[in-house]
Structure formats: structure tokens, C-alpha cells
Amino acid sequence: MQSDINKNHLTMTEGLTYINESGLKEEESKNIVGYNINGSIIDLFTPLPTITKEVIPITIDSEDGLEMLRHSAAHILAAAVKNLFPTVKISIGPSIENGFYYDFDAERPFTPEDFPAIEAEMQRIINESIPFERIEISKAEALEFFSSLHENYKVEIINSLEDGNITLYRIGNFTDLCKGPHVPNTNFIKAFKLLSVAGAYWRGNENNQMLSRIYATAFPNKKLLKTYLTQLEEAKRRDHRKLGKELNLFEFHEDIAPGMVFWQPNGMLLRTILEDFLRKEHLKRGYQLVQGPQLLRRELWEKSGHYTNYKENMYFTEIEEDVYGIKPMNCVSHMLLYKTHLHSYRELPQRYFELGVVHRHEKSGVLHGLLRVRQFTQDDAHIICMPEQLEEEIIQVITFVRDLMSLFDFNYHIVISTRPEKSIGSDYAWELATSALIQAVEKINLPYSINHGDGAFYGPKIDIKVTDAIGREWQLSTIQCDFTLPERFELEYVGQDGKRHQPVMIHRAIFGSIERFIGILTEHYAGAFPTWLTPIQVKILTVTDAQTPFAKHVYSQLQDVGIRVGLDIRNEKLGFKIREAQLAKIPYILVIGQKELELESVNVRLRTGENIGMQSVTEFIKLVENDCIQPFKRGGMNYRFS
């Protein structure tokens, strides 16, 4: 079989010929790993099609080049593992954001203790500059080849493919099923690191074999790798799951409620502050507060399309022989609220806002702290308006998003997602909705990109992606335009002409999930939340028992003006109490000793360790008030102190 594969071996000749004739400098051509031709990414092994448009070279340090590099590194990882552990079966190994992984069926799961040996073998393969060879064979030949190697996972994949030629890639004595593209040889991987191990079910199905997944990353040079590893260490320090325990915010009990949050007192206070702020901001902007039930009959979910398109993510229960769905979204309830009476065009838009608890089934393997849960609260709003009001309403929502992102000091960018393969509604409605989103964004001169095919099943959407303090990207806000559900639920309004018309609906969530947003904020601020949001803003510490009465008096003064304050009058060493307050990331620490008692003042320290010095209680209250107000000025909003 090996000789049959050899005779189908394709070389890099055509790709290299193009590069040599392209007029590029020798140094530039060294970094080229492929090309973009007619919108397709092709490596140097793939025969060139008839060139009808511009051919764009892909360099190793470009986004496409980096993806090729990591995909190739995944093959090197698999080759190294097979060399060291010959009985291991290989499954899949794609590139992913910031790295790659490979899944193995091993006699025992891999552990980090295996990494040094695997990395050494990978480095040996890299040092030999082994070329990646592209091979095309028939489906029957591919089945025969992988069956002879007892690679059952590859056989299963091949059986699921349509008849025709199958593409393989080979480095040395290791051959893998793969479409490519890949870098020219193994020595293009200049820097890599194995990161972690995890369990992963074959094809993501919990009924299938549990595989051992090795996560890793690779970069074109060691400097980029070092920067990334430093960022990873910083991310570990900021991990919201770690900080959540340390700051008494939240916890999980996966044995009894997987993917559901238990809020501790500090976390519940922080969440309440955030939710109260959201309610006030929505009321100021013309929204009405509403709330719908948790359970709705299955017929409503069938009517909305959720039962057909989203059933696998929903929970159902039976009550008195009727099937009910636990809501995964709030839109159905909001449409029913709208329908309680007939609206005039003068009443539009109707803006409904709900901090709605929803449930969505996520597989246990993807649950991740607050960032991926099964029960969460959406800051969910639905705006029902006339088609001619649509653009202005979208602009107002984007403005709201901009204000909130400024408040939390997030940079952001906009992505518009278009119609997915699995969708409902007419072509005309989709075109109209997509056009409205694009026009609204362009009208306020904001840059955006298009993500084809990633819209909701009922309409296109705007996704707002933010960058946190250490450069990581998170998707937060979503704005969706929907002509379909108003039609399905027969929403109407009486127009200026006295006739009934169908409105359009905007689905939008700015934070998306309160739980997820708090998780992101925790990591963004490394647990040191801004003063206005911190559960405990001030901690009063006494030096001896003699200061206790005055400390209690200061405590009452601060409470009276709305400052969230704690009091520590324990008979402990002052240094210990200060350190404890700093670890709790309390913004202000007030020390009251004999001198402060005599002057009826407080000694002000910051959580950073800086000592501001002596202040009167009145001066300190003003300091805290200004600290709370400052972020809201940046966000273009007002802050009510108490």
C-alpha cells in the first residue's frame, strides 16, 4: 500500500514556480507558505488551478499563515506521539484560536508529565526539516490504508465522506488524513509549547469513547511564543473561577447542579448593583420593565421555530400530559405581552426589557465557570417598531452599547452576521433586515466586518466583540433584526392610514449574560472592581479596642451616605488586618489609631498599598464619591451616589 501512495505523491513544483516568477525578493519568498487564489487558501503542494484573479501570497506571520503553521504542528504532535506510543490511535487535530490540539485514544490518558518526552520528539522531527507531502488516492485505497494500520477513527471519517479522491499528508513515516493546507516542511515551526490535557468525547458525543486531548500552541518565532505564554500566566492569575472563591463571589457544585451558579454574599451584592444600574439605565432610555414565565407550552416553541431549530439546547417537562419547554430565550413572552392589546403607530416603538433567567443545555465538556453555564440571566430587550423606525432604533442600541463599553473601559469592534444555512423566513425579509443593520452601522461611521452565515435562525445580527485588559477578545452584545417572528405570531399595529400592519422586532442583549459578563469583568479587572461596583468599598480597621466606639461612628456616617462599608475591630495585628483587606481587593482601607481618634480623622490606604494619609471623614466621603463618578463621565452617563 505504501508504494501505491508514493506513486500519487504531488510535489511543490507548481507553487514554487509561481513564487519564483512573482518578482518577490528572496527574503520575502522564504516566508511564503501558500497563496490565496480566488478566495481559497492553498499550500505549495496543491496544483495551481487556472488563474482568473489575483494570487495573494500567504506569509508565515499572516493570520492564514499562522493557521497553517498550527495545523502543521498538530500533525507533528501526532507523529511524535505515534513514535513514542505506537499503540495509540489517532483521531483529529485541527488548529484553533491561539493554538491547536490533537485527540488520541490511548491506553491511559496523557498527563503533563508526558510533555517533556513528546516535546523532545517533536523538536527532533522539526530539526530534520522533513517535507510535508500531499497525496491523493481513491476512497477505497484510503480505507484499505488506514484499515491496515488499525486506525479506526480515520476509517470512520473516510466512510462518512462522499466518493472521490481522498487527500492525505505525510511527514516521514507518519501519514494522516487531511485536506491541508500545510507549511512546506517541519522546520517552519520555530516555536511551540504543549499546554494542557483534557478529556474529549469522540465527535463530541457523550455516548462515544472518551479521548485524551493535548492542547498546544505554535508561533513563527520564540518571541511571539514567550509573549503568549506570559499572557497565559496572567490569564491564570486573573481566572474568574479562582478569584470567585478568593473574593467570596460565587461557587459551583457540579455534582448536584452542573453549569449553575451558587452566589455568595459578595457576588450577589455585586450582581444586584449591576442589575439595578441596568434597570435604571433602561428606564432612562424609554424601555419598559417586563417579565415572562419560565415554562411555555411546546406549541409556542413550535410556532416560534425554536422547537425545530433549537430543540437540542432546550429542556422539556411534562405537566398534566402537556409538554412544556423551559425558556431558552425571552422573545416569545415579549411578543405575547405585545399582543395583549392592539397598538397604534403612535405607541411605537415598544421597548420591553427583562432580566430574564433562561436555561440552555450545554454539554458537560464545554461548561466553564461563569463563561459557559446552563442557567443564566440575559439583559434581554425586544424593540417592536415600524419598519421605517428600524434604522434609528438600531443606532440607539449601538449608542447604548458604546456608552456601557466606555464605562467598563472596553475597546470593541462590530461584526455583522448574515443568514445561516439553518434558518426561517423569506429571502426578501433577510435581505431587508441585513441591509438595515449595515445601514445603521454605516450611518454612525463605525467600522465593521461581515461574518457570513453566522446569524440567528430567525434573522441577521450585529455582534459586539470587546478586548479586555490583557488583549483577549470576548463577544458581548448582540443586536438581531427579525421580520419573521412578528409574522409568525401575527403582531400588528394600526398605521396612520387606519389599516393594520406588521411591525419588525429587534432582539438585543448588551451584556448577553449577567453571569458571563461578571466572569469577564472579574478577569478584566483581576478582581479589583471599580469602586462603584465593588461589593465592599471601604474597610475600617482599628488598632486597639480604644478606637472601637469612634470606628463604629465612622461606620455609621459612611453607611448613611450610601457607602458600602465593613468594620474590623478584631483583636488582631494591624498588619494582618491590612493584608487581609488588600487580598479582598477592597478599594479603601481606613486605619483608626490613637492619633486618628484624637483628631477625629481616618488614615486612608488604597488596596494597591499606597498610603494617602490623614483625612477628615467628610473629605474621605468626597474622595469616594468622585472615584465612583469618574467612570460614568467616560461613559457619558450620570451616577447617583446613594
Swiss-Prot record:
Name of the molecule in the record: Threonine--tRNA ligase
GO terms under cellular component: cytoplasm
Function: Catalyzes the attachment of threonine to tRNA(Thr) in a two-step reaction: L-threonine is first activated by ATP to form Thr-AMP and then transferred to the acceptor end of tRNA(Thr). Also edits incorrectly charged L-seryl-tRNA(Thr).
Subunit structure: Homodimer.
Residues reported to bind Zn(2+): C331, H382, H507
Gene Ontology MF terms: ATP binding; metal ion binding; threonine-tRNA ligase activity; tRNA binding
Family indicated by similarity: Belongs to the class-II aminoacyl-tRNA synthetase family.
Cofactor remark: Binds 1 zinc ion per subunit.
SUPFAM superfamilies: Class II aaRS ABD-related (SSF52954), Class II aaRS and biotin synthetases (SSF55681), ThrRS/AlaRS common domain (SSF55186)
EC category name: ligase
Protein source organism: Lawsonia intracellularis (strain PHE/MN1-00)
Protein keywords: Aminoacyl-tRNA synthetase, ATP-binding, Cytoplasm, Ligase, Metal-binding, Nucleotide-binding, Protein biosynthesis, RNA-binding, tRNA-binding, Zinc
Chief site of localization: cytoplasm
Cysteine disulfide links: none
Cofactor: Zn(2+)
One of the protein's GO biological processes: threonyl-tRNA aminoacylation
Taxonomy, superkingdom: Bacteria
HAMAP family xrefs: Thr_tRNA_synth
